[in-house]
């Protein structure tokens, strides 16, 4: 038996490149650190991987000639020629990665206006859906209600939702989902609020845990149900792992609120804290975990290899701690890391130089692809152990029965391990600053 082996490595030209397969042996394995995979030890189902259609990302895409714009969508969403994205996210109203503050409801008497989305965002999502073929699961998140619904009277700098506007905002979110669906953009899920504990200089809105619980229980949940939208998955928190358990458990411990909630979304900006995901999963095993945002802050640094390694570390950590899907932030940005209307520059897996009409894949693109191209929607994460020598790994079984194991080495020297699968084994070596995906034939 052989395992197909795909590699990306800093110090070679390998970029999702096939290299010599691994030969599987029987009998005693060598005295090496052990990665032990139990093919019968199935854990959570994997929904897939994806990124965000922000107004900024879609503006950058629109700055390119049509064939180059199509090539980027192919690179992300095509199941064979690309890296097989099947998840996506976008924002309700503007966010920091927009061209300025704007809302779909400019006043108390205004009706829903999706014209801003039809300029660039919806066309890009439609293009991705056409390329993907299979349905894309789209998650939508508000950064702020319209200014007139808030205590602060502005979309930026925090503030809270006015108590008198809770029903209004809940109904507005229902209208947004229905309006987008009428425009041919199917919504899979909704988060209550992006980063509800962050008072940002850009669009933000603060909720305490109890305020989020009460809004879900008394306003948003009933509104979604009354509108016939209760099949849309509702996620709480949508902020960092550090407080994911403490925040989510306030909502999920209330049965009247929890019945409306599919699961919890979270980000990476506070650090690893993967153990908090375990704690939340074990406390509420019937609810779900979804990574909803992560990116490198501080602008673009072309060619930096640590970009991809950070992604692999977090994807492996999240999947090994019950996460079911993984969403990157902006699909593409310009060479400065924008546009961003408050100067919050970030990096992205694809960087576009519109003046030259070219685009570049960062290491993060290749590293994400080691998961998203090969761990397919409907896969089951398998129980596996870590080698303990610096190699990080995760294993999954695809719906067709094929086995997928991703192994990453972020260190400065090659690392070896004995990979054992149900008693059979192979000796595996991963070069310094490299990642490998191993694929076994369907059983």
Give residue ranges: language-model regions:
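Active-site neighborhood of glycoside hydrolase catalytic domains
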Residues: 168-175, 179-186, 196-299
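Carbohydrate-binding surface patches
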Residues: 373, 384-422, 433
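Loop/turn elements at helix/coil->beta-strand transitions in domains of secreted/extracellular proteins
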Residues: 81-88, 133-137, 183-189, 229-233, ...
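Alpha-helical scaffolding within the catalytic cores
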Residues: 28-41, 123-124, 175, 218-219, ...
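Conserved, mostly hydrophobic/aromatic
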Residues: 51, 84, 138, 190, ...
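C-terminal beta-strand-rich structural cap/linker in extracellular carbohydrate-active enzymes
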Residues: 430-443
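Aromatic/acidic polysaccharide-binding cleft in carbohydrate-active enzymes
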Residues: 288-367, 383-386
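N-terminal catalytic cores of secreted or lumenal carbohydrate-active enzymes
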Residues: 14-187, 208, 218
């Amino acid at each position: 038996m052989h395992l197909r082996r795909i590699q990306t490595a800093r110090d070679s030209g390998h970029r999702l490149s096939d290299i010599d397969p691994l030969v599987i042996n029987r009998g005693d394995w060598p005295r090496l650190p052990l990665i032990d995979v139990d093919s019968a030890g199935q854990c959570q189902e994997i929904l897939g991987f994806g990124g965000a259609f922000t107004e900024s990302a879609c503006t950058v895409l629109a700055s390119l000639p049509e064939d180059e714009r199509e090539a980027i969508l192919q690179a992300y969403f095509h199941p064979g020629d690309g890296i097989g994205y099947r998840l996506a996210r976008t924002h309700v109203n503007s966010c920091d990665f927009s061209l300025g503050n704007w809302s779909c409801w400019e006043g108390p008497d205004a009706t829903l206006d999706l014209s801003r989305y039809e300029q660039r965002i919806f066309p890009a999502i439609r293009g991705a859906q056409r390329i993907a073929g299979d349905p894309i699961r789209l998650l939508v998140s508000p950064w702020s209600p319209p200014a007139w619904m808030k205590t602060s009277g502005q979309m930026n700098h925090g503030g809270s939702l006015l108590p008198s506007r809770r029903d209004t905002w809940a109904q507005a979110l229902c209208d947004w989902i229905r309006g987008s669906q009428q425009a041919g953009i199917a919504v899979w899920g909704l988060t209550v609020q992006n980063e509800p504990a962050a008072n940002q200089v850009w669009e933000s809105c603060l909720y305490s845990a109890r305020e989020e619980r009460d809004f879900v229980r008394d306003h948003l949940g009933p509104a979604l149900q009354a509108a016939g939208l209760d099949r849309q998955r509702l996620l709480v928190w949508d902020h960092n792992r550090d407080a994911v358990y403490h925040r989510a458990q306030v909502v999920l411990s209330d049965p009247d609120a929890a019945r409306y909630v599919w699961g919890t979304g979270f980000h990476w900006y506070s650090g690893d804290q993967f153990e908090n995901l375990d704690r939340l999963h074990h406390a509420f095993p019937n609810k779900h975990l979804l990574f909803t945002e992560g990116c490198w802050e501080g602008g673009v640094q072309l060619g930096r290899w640590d970009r991809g390694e950070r992604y692999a570390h977090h994807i492996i950590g999240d999947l090994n701690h019950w996460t079911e899907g993984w969403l990157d932030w902006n699909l593409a940005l310009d060479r400065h890391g924008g546009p961003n209307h408050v100067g919050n520059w970030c990096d992205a897996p694809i960087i576009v130089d519109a003046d030259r009409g070219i685009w570049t894949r960062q290491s993060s693109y290749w590293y994400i692809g080691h998961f998203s191209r090969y761990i397919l929607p409907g896969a089951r994460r398998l129980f596996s152990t870590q080698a303990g020598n610096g190699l990080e790994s995760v294993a999954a079984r695809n719906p067709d029965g094929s086995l997928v194991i991703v192994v990453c080495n972020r260190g400065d020297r090659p690392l070896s391990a004995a990979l054992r699968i149900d008693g059979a084994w192979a000796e595996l070596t991963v070069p310094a600053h490299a990642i490998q995906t191993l694929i076994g034939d369907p059983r």
